[in-house]
Amino acid sequence: MTTPAGRALIVSVTDDLVHGDNDHGAGALVTELLVEAGFVVDGSLAVPSESVGIRSALNTGVIGGVDLIVTVGGTGVTPRDVTPDVTAEVIDRGLPGIAEALRWSGMAAGVTDAVVSRGVVGVSGSTVIANVAGSRAAIRDGLATLIPLARHTIDELSDPVMG
C-alpha cells in the first residue's frame, strides 16, 4: 500500500455563495487532482470572500492538523479579493518562491493574467497553505506546479532531523 502524500483541506472562496450559487466545481476539481496525487482530502469548505470566514476555515485546517490547505479564488486585485491578505496573517513563514512558481507556470501556460494573482504560499505550524486562482485552467496548472513543491515542503516539515 502506498503511503498518502498527506492530508489536505480545500477552501473555496467565492461571493457566489452569497447569491445561493456554489463554487462552480472548483472544490471538486482540486479534490480530484489532490486525490490523484495521493493526498487524502479531509474536506472541502466553501466560504464567502470575507476575512472572518476565510480565517476560520484556515484555522480549522491548521488546528485539525492537515498537511496542506489549498484555497481557491479571491486572489485578484478587487477590494473583495482578500484571500492572500488573510493567508498572510495566518502563516508563520512565507514561501514566496512557490507563489512565484505558481504565477510563472501560469504565464508559461499562456494565462497572461497569472501575474496579476496576489496569491501567497506559506506555512502555519506544520501546515502548508497555498492560494490558487479560481479558474479551472488556473487550478489545473497551479496544482501541477504546487503538488510536487508541497510534497517536498511537507516532507521537510515532518522530518524530525530537518524540522
Describe every region a protein language model picked out:
Residues 1-163:
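Non-catalytic beta/alpha edge segments that cap or flank active sites
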